[in-house]
Amino acid sequence: MTPALSAEEIRDVNTRYHDVAADHYDAKWGIDFGDLGQSQVTAKVRKALGRNDGPFARSLEIGSGTGYFTLNLMRAGLVEKAMCTDISPGMLSTLSANAQRLGLDVETLATDAESLPFEDESFDLVIGHAILHHIPDLGRAFREFERVLRPGGTVLFAGEPSRYGDRIANVPKRVATAAAPIWRRAIKARPASPADGGAPEASLEGLVDVHAFSPGELSSFAREADLEDVKVIGEELLANWFGWTNRTLEATAHPEDVPWGWRNYAYKGYLALQKVDRTLLESRLPPAIFYNLIITASKP
């Protein structure tokens, strides 16, 4: 059994992994800064906040990565000024390049979420996407979020893995792994080699995710930090199963051998099932069953 990493080791692994991944991260995860990305991000925010969705004068993003959340919110006019932080300088470098290409002005700072170098009550909005599950001490981090938030301000974190939803997602992953040789023969693809996309950080990928959450556990971090109006909702069920099936299959093949027709099918199918999840399932099923959780809270 691999011994548990210390908090400092988790931070170090996350820094190294994301520094190496930064150059091809957007391509790997299909991150978009056009109309599609903007509509996806604004849909998450409006789903979580309802009519109280801004615009926000000054936002702080934790674990900004390459800018998916903040840059799309700025393009949509929901955020006016933004500070983007990440433990990875490499990610922030890619974010800055993306912002320059989009004509957006953002501040960036490499820092740890558990010890933010900002004055009290500095921001109207504290946000993040797929970041909380990387942070060793979430209690300390949420106390920092509360400290730097102005009274009446909002906390919003999306894309956090649900413990039960993550277990369910292992089923399509296992099925896809078993079916991969047949799938590769059908599309005439060679098996992937160790040199295919992402090899430099592959050895660290299994170490960077340190949490999966139940809705109650995620809520407790916000409440213990004296935040109010705490709400957790779930998103993506069918779309997630479909997406993980396709990602698992594609990871077994040479990238250049995966035909455009397949990628188009996977892309359009994912969007279609996102719509099914959003319109039919998310309001009817408990949050814990979904793959992703969104948490919102406010500072009194």
Model regions and ranges:
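A short SAM/SAH-binding and catalytic strip from SAM-dependent methyltransferases
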Residues: 125-136
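Class I SAM-dependent methyltransferase SAM/SAH-binding core
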Residues: 60-115
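A short acidic, Gly/Pro-enriched loop at the edge of an enzyme's catalytic core
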Residues: 114-125
